[in-house]
UniProtKB/Swiss-Prot annotation:
Cofactor(s) annotated in UniProt: Mg(2+); Zn(2+)
Domain of life: Bacteria
Subunit structure: The RNAP catalytic core consists of 2 alpha, 1 beta, 1 beta' and 1 omega subunit. When a sigma factor is associated with the core the holoenzyme is formed, which can initiate transcription.
InterPro entries: DNA-dir_RpoC_beta_prime, DNA-dir_RpoC_beta_prime_bact, RNA_pol_asu, RNA_pol_N, RNA_pol_Rpb1_1, RNA_pol_Rpb1_3, RNA_pol_Rpb1_3_sf, RNA_pol_Rpb1_4
Record protein name field: DNA-directed RNA polymerase subunit beta'
Pfam families, per the entry: RNA_pol_Rpb1_1, RNA_pol_Rpb1_2, RNA_pol_Rpb1_3, RNA_pol_Rpb1_4, RNA_pol_Rpb1_5
Tagged with keyword Glycosyltransferase: no
Gene3D superfamilies found in the cross-reference section: 1.10.132.30, 1.10.150.390, 1.10.1790.20, 1.10.40.90, 2.40.40.20, 2.40.50.100, RNA polymerase II, clamp domain, RNA polymerase Rpb1, domain 3
One GO term of the biological process aspect: DNA-templated transcription
Length: 1394
């Protein structure tokens, strides 16, 4: 490995090295780099502006200020190149060496490098086993430290105060032991680091052996952890070959002067880089210290000077890390070397990862309705500027000019020849258009420029969705790809016509929107009594002729013979069929075409006819849509907002219901929380009903006309109300917004997210009164504030995702994985949310998929499941399929083609080299920003579903109960007494049609084996509270329910009634409970076990029964109020997604069972309840294998004695903890849970993302294992290692006949995972730069430049896509353009003749 500083000699080709290593620099190394010592703090002479000799800008050390000219002016020009001037000592050479030559400062005393001292954990402290506090005392000259105790009783590394040191000198004499303070002492200690006893060897390797031995003997966990930490640092030194004393600085490098320039301003002042100030401080203090040492000054003065020097060096390396921040004259902290690297403005992110580009311009965009999909309009003036070099070249080639200078003049005069040449230059030369923020790869696309007058760029309307652009003043940037390779990539990979499908979900992203949809929708609608209704035509051509002649209307219903069949259709649809590819059947468009249908049409065309046809179709649809939208002449008038007639009655009814509930509350029948929830529900329901009435009235109309027999006739038909048309077609607006215009605005949310219980009953058409307007402003403002915040949050989420997934690249065809995941339909609450077909499309089958009945192979193992095969699978009635997945891919680096499956943006299997990690990150991050930007459109109107409190079946069939235990009340009703019971509806053959989970405390309205009709009520429950129910009849006895201690009687101010609620008590032994006694006062036993009928009450439970009441089995004895619902919005969303990907532990997470078994309660300890789960083996309970869990007092335990629980099931209420799921259920279950949870957030917003993207991120989060048992491997206990490194090391040890290490899978959040990547360059450019670099330097890390980020930073091509190693040797041959043009012209001529 070459020394990196040879970089500074001549610019190297970035491809000439394959890895880069970082390590500590020794003092000799620094002197070797240096071109001379900087002795004086002076910079330049302010009169002559010449650099001072031996100063910070010295020309002798760093090189001449002007090219080939020495300082005193004796030697000038090229002919003296390489001479060293004997007068001023300057070498005659180019001045740019001042950007690469280093100097050095020799320090009078060694100084600690602050990174290794203060970056936690302190490396120097760890190595010497001294605490940071003590270390600082020594370094900043406050205490002495024993370096060599010799014969005395001191320990090596012991601290002595001034008094103690003097006493010891008196006691033992001067030579009896050596102690010191300041840098020299620490340097001495570091030089002598080694084991306590000689048996382990010498120096650092000896120390490592000793620590390993100690670790084997260590008894306590804490001690083992401490040793492991120290061992980690020691091992790093052993492995890297760094010497510990190099963490102390004896020589400091001075960076080249042109990297810390001094610029004269007008008025004789100078602007300088902060580094010069920091270096000046160091030199001043160093020189002063040298002088004091020569003068033999008193100890105390020298000590003070040493401390100041240490502080000055600290500030130079990392200002503000320790002590006071050093500020400049303007009270601004000085920017130290570390600050140059850190943060968004640091070297990494500002200059290495993002650079400014030449050949670019930006301008406002306007719509270009007549452009083809692959074109964009480029203003002539812009094109002239961007393509200048090409124009100069052509002008010279054609002989118009002889020199570049004259070419320049010609272009400036804008002569006619220039415009001709410009036309020729830009023909077929694609340009890239980019709209900021670029949230996914479709934010940059390539187009062929068309020259236009004016100053605005014209954009094709169909690509607006991808860019998220609109024409209200958006700007876009244009970039010119210069090289042939770049042009080729732009054309093949980035052309807008090659990006029809979205990489996020694989559906078209080039879809008609707004006016286009409106026009197509309008032309495919049918209008009653239109001119020419009922006519019959022999062919589509006849229809067209009749329409052109004005014989039939666009929306008239007619009969036409199509492909030999008579079809009933409308004129508009026949005209639309004219532009659709012939492969598509007429049925595909013989319906009202709204936005969804149009997306389906484009999708279908893409699958059946390919890319080219799709592009042509898109352009034709665009033109036809715009044309018909114009002809439709749709406008909005006040009268179009139809307020439903029934609104008044509905509102009156709701007010009455609310009054009833208020009355119930006043009588004390319900709690304040239930009242609030019920009121909210009533209003939510009424708002819905008003909206439905309104949509009903606005959505249909009665058409009057003359029937066939000439009589007046009325017909109902879908309305032609413009507002309805816009919403129904999907062009603009939603039912939600129309509701606010013409229905009622409904419930609003407070900024805290609670719902205000008085809704806004008015709509915008009627107008709001002052109070209503005021309530509205709440929501609207919150929307705007949220938008600003969430955009930033979302961007940050995307950045973290990209960082963690940037090295997930497709690297091989097949990893040979034998494992996969099982996918079925996604069902929630008995409804199929996502059918299985959608989830398995484009994946690769793991095993043969067989038809359940015939046993035929539908899909072979390792075949892609495409649209056709999905149909086969769905028709065969298979409900679960095993597929290959990124999660189980065995590729050592990256991912293999088979496990990934289809590249969604191309609709075929993924290519090798595709950067699927980045695509996944963009697909997840992009909608985050979209959603955040879209919150305020509804103006904070609260959207909330009425709580589900019943189960209805959708299909008729037979009822079957699965794991349902019930209590029968005396009136015969059945109450469900456990939590994980299910009601299953089966058909006559006994096949399961649907399945519903039933809640604890629900009232069953059906019995086992009962026949039910469709949509029958099966069960109902109280949605607002969780009941605690007794299983036996008897008399209530309170236990530990003491007023004011464990229960409080709260008297309601409004109703004056008292209600008892359990409160948290100070007494740790109090166990509030209710027991059920029999006549003799003995506690009753539960029916199915020998446990007592005792019910523990969690905090917050409301008591429903009094002491001594008689109760029946199935009665409610206490209620737990459920939280009042907050509005569901992506606010729950974005932070939720971040929380999931960061793998945070929820605050109040549920304890889950680690085994299957039967629940029992043990003795309480320390005020916590003990739940014991006993497993069954072969039908027998095995108490020896039981697991115990302690659950905090006041938490609601959701299992009961005798319940059977499965592993991974929650024992109490609370959020799931992903780390628990991983530990108990394993990686696949965790991955499934994460995918479902993330998807749920996006689904609420109607955003589609393919599962495989989330899986890709989860794979990156699960890359590591934690070592539990080291075996004979090189690992340390509790160390986190990459999975594959772990497997390789184990293989090595097993081959040698040793014992393998044991590890447990580890789930890292995305930030942690990014920081722990193998590449230190990538990690340091992400976050915590200094920490990452400190660690990397000590362990002498090597970065093999495998990820994308490291390569961008090193200025190489990324190892993905066309930059992949496999494609490196391909060269592109260019035909001379002249031949190509001639060939093309010949071909055209031949084509024309044919």
């Amino acid at each position: 490995m070459k020394d990196i500083f040879n970089f500074f000699e001549k610019p190297k080709d970035p491809l000439s090295f394959s890895a880069i290593r970082i390590s500590l620099a020794s003092p000799d190394k620094i002197r070797q780099w240096s071109h001379g010592e900087v002795k004086k703090p002076e910079t330049i002479n302010y009169r002559t502006f010449k650099p001072e000799r031996d100063g910070l800008f010295c020309a002798k050390i760093f090189g001449p200020v002007k090219d080939y000219e020495c300082n005193c002016g004796k030697y000038k020009r090229m002919k003296h190149r390489g001479v060293v001037c004997e007068k001023c000592g300057v070498e005659v050479i180019q001045s740019k060496v001042r950007r690469e030559r280093l100097g050095h400062i020799t320090l009078a005393t060694p100084v600690a490098h602050i990174w290794f001292l203060k970056s936690l954990p302190s490396r120097i402290g760890n190595l010497l086993d001294i605490t940071l506090k003590d270390l600082e005392k020594v370094l900043y000259c406050e205490s002495y430290i024993v370096i060599d105790p010799k014969e005395t009783t001191f320990q090596r590394g012991e601290l002595l105060s001034e008094d103690r040191y003097q006493k010891a000198l008196d006691e033992f004499g001067d030579d009896a032991f050596s102690a010191g303070m300041g840098g020299e002492a620490v340097l001495g200690l570091l030089r002598g680091v080694g084991p306590a006893s000689k048996e382990h060897g010498e120096g650092i390797p000896g120390l490592a052996n000793e620590l390993r031995a100690e670790m084997k003997e260590a008894t306590s966990d804490a001690k083992r952890k401490k040793i492991a930490k120290r061992l980690k640092v020691v091992e790093a030194f052993v492995a890297s070959g760094n010497k510990p004393e190099w963490m102390m600085l004896e020589v400091i490098p001075v960076i080249p002067p042109d990297l810390r320039p001094l610029v004269p301003l007008d008025g004789g002042r100078f602007a300088t880089s902060d580094l010069n100030d920091l270096y000046r401080r160091v030199i001043n203090r160093n020189n002063r210290l040298k002088r004091l040492q020569e003068l033999n000054a008193p100890d105390i003065i020298i000590r003070n000077e040493k401390r100041m020097l240490q502080e000055a060096v600290d500030a130079l390396f990392d200002n503000g890390r320790r002590g006071k921040t050093i500020t400049g004259p303007n009270k601004r902290p000085l920017k130290s070397l570390s600050d140059m690297l850190k943060g968004k403005q640091g070297r990494f992110r500002q200059n290495l990862l993002g650079k400014r580009v030449d050949y670019s311009g930006r301008s406002v965009i306007v719509v270009g309705p007549e452009l083809k999909l692959h074109q964009c309009g480029l203003p002539k003036i812009m094109a002239l500027e961007l393509f200048k070099p090409f124009i100069y070249n052509k002008l010279e080639e054609k002989g118009y000019v002889t020199t570049i200078k004259s070419a320049k003049k010609m272009v400036e005069k804008e002569r006619p020849e220039v415009w001709d040449i410009l036309d020729e230059v830009i023909r077929e030369h694609p340009v890239l258009l980019n709209r900021a923020p670029t949230l996914h790869r479709l934010g940059i696309q390539a187009f062929e420029p068309v020259l236009i007058e004016g100053k605005a760029i014209q954009l094709h309307p169909l690509v607006c969705t991808a860019f998220n652009a609109d024409f209200d003043g958006d700007q876009m940037a244009v970039h010119v790809p210069l090289s042939i390779e770049a042009q080729m990539e732009a054309r093949v990979l980035m052309m807008s016509t090659n990006n029809i499908l979205s990489p996020a979900h694989g559906k078209p992203i080039i879809v008609p929107s707004q006016d286009i949809v409106l026009g197509i929708y309008y032309m495919t609608r049918e209008r009653a009594f239109a001119r020419g209704e009922g006519k019959v035509f022999a062919s589509p051509e006849e229809v067209r002729a009749a329409y052109d002649q004005g014989e039939v209307d666009l929306q008239a219903k007619v009969w036409v013979r199509m492909d030999g069949k008579r079809v009933e259709t409308t004129v508009g649809r026949v005209l639309l069929y004219d532009i659709v590819p012939r492969r598509l059947s007429f049925d595909a468009i013989n319906k009202v075409m709204d936005k969804k249908q149009l997306q389906g049409l484009i999708d279908l065309t893409y699958r059946l006819c390919g890319e080219k046809e799709t592009v042509l179709l898109a352009d034709r649809v665009r033109s036809m849509g715009y044309g018909n939208a114009t002809r439709a002449g749709i406008s909005i008038a006040l009268d179009n907002m139809v307020i439903p007639r029934k609104k008044v009655d509905l509102l009156e009814r709701a007010t009455r219901e609310v009054d009833d509930i208020q009355a119930q509350y006043t009588e004390g029948l319900i709690t304040i929380g239930e009242r609030y929830n019920k009121v909210i529900d009533i209003w939510a329901q009424v708002t819905e009903e008003v909206a439905q009435e309104m949509m009903g009235e606005i959505g249909t109309e009665t058409a009057v006309g003359t029937g066939k027999d000439g009589k007046r006739e009325e017909r109902r038909q879908p309305s032609f109300n413009p507002i309805y048309i816009m919403a129904d077609s999907g062009a603009r607006g939603s039912a939600q917004q129309i509701r606010q215009l013409a229905g009622m605005r409904g419930l609003m949310a407070k900024p805290s997210g609670e719902i205000i219980e008085t809704p806004i009953t008015a709509n915008f058409r009627e107008g709001l009164n002052v109070l209503q307007y005021f309530i509205s402003t709440h929501g609207a403002r919150k929307g705007l504030a949220d938008t600003a915040l969430k955009t930033a949050n979302s961007g940050y989420l995307t950045r973290r995702l990209v960082d963690v997934a940037q090295d997930a690249i497709i690297t091989e065809y097949d990893c040979g994985a034998m494992d996969g995941i099982t996918l079925g339909a996604l069902v929630e609450g008995g409804e199929i949310i996502e059918p299985m077909g959608e989830r398995i499309l484009g994946r690769v089958a793991l095993d043969d998929i067989l038809d359940a009945f015939s046993g035929n192979v539908l899909v072979k193992a390792n075949e892609e499941i495409d649209e056709g095969r999905v149909k086969l699978i769905e028709n065969s009635g298979i409900d679960k399929v095993k597929i290959r997945s990124v999660l189980t891919c065995q590729a050592r680096r990256g991912i293999c083609v088979e496990c990934y499956g289809r590249d969604l943006a191309r609709g075929r299997k993924v290519n090798i080299g595709e950067a699927v990690g980045v695509i996944a990150a963009q697909s997840i991050g992009e909608p985050g920003t979209q959603l955040t930007m879209r919150t305020f459109h509804i103006g904070g109107a609260a959207s909330r579903r009425a709580e589900q409190s019943t189960i209805e079946n959708r299909n008729a069939g037979l009822i079957k109960f699965n794991n349902v235990s019930v209590a029968k009340k005396h009136d015969g009703t059945l109450i469900v007494m456990n939590r994980n019971g299910e009601i299953i509806v089966t058909d006559d053959q006994g096949r399961e049609r649907e399945r519903y989970g039933v809640v604890y405390g629900a009232k069953l309205l059906v019995r086992e084996g009962q026949k039910v009709e469709a949509n029958q009520l099966l069960a109902e429950w109280d949605p607002y509270s969780m009941p605690i129910i007794t299983e036996v009849a008897g008399r209530v006895k309170y236990g530990d329910l003491v007023d004011g201690v464990t229960i409080s009687e709260q008297v309601d101010e409004i109703t004056g009634l008292a209600r008892k609620a359990v409160i948290a008590s100070k007494d740790p032994d109090a166990r509030p409970r209710i027991s059920i006694k029999d006549e003799e006062g003995k506690t009753k036993k539960l029916a199915n076990s020998d446990a007592d009928a005792r019910y523990m009450l969690p905090e917050g439970a409301n008591l429903v029964v009094n002491d001594g009441d008689e109760v029946d089995a199935g009665d409610v004895i206490a209620k737990m109020p459920r939280e009042t619902t907050k509005t569901k919005d992506i606010t729950g969303g974005l932070p939720r997604v971040a929380e999931l990907f960061e793998a945070r532990k929820p605050k109040e997470h549920a304890v889950i069972s680690e085994i299957d078994g039967v629940v029992a309660f043990g003795k309480d300890t320390k005020g916590k309840r003990k739940v014991v789960i006993t497993p069954e083996v072969d039908g027998k309970l095995r108490p020896d294998l039981a697991k115990e869990y302690l659950i905090g007092k006041g938490k609601h335990i959701s299992v009961h004695t005798g319940d059977r629980v499965r592993a991974g099931e929650a024992l109490m209420d609370g959020a799931a903890n992903p780390h628990d799921i991983l530990r108990v259920l394993g990686e696949k279950e965790l991955a499934r849970w994460l995918v479902d949870e993330v998807q749920e957030v996006y689904r609420l917003q109607g955003v589609k993302i393919n599962d495989k993207h989330i899986e890709t991120i989860v794979r990156q989060m699960l890359r590591r294992v934690r070592i539990v048992d080291v075996g004979d491997t090189e690992f340390l206990a509790d160390e986190q290692v990459e999975k594959f490194a772990f497997e390789e090391e184990n293989e090595r040890v097993l081959k040698a006949g040793g014992r393998a290490a044991q590890g447990e899978p580890l789930l890292l959040g995305i930030t942690k995972a990014s920081l722990s990547t193998e590449s230190f360059i990538s990690a340091s450019s992400f976050q915590e730069t200094t920490k990452v670099l400190t660690e990397a330097a000590i362990s002498g890390k090597v970065d093999y430049l495998r990820g994308l980020k490291e390569n961008v930073i090193m200025g190489r091509l990324v190892p993905a896509g066309t930059g992949l190693g496999a494609y490196k040797h391909l060269d592109i041959e260019v035909e001379t353009p002249v031949d190509a043009v001639e060939e093309a012209e010949e071909a055209l001529a031949v084509g024309a003749e044919e």
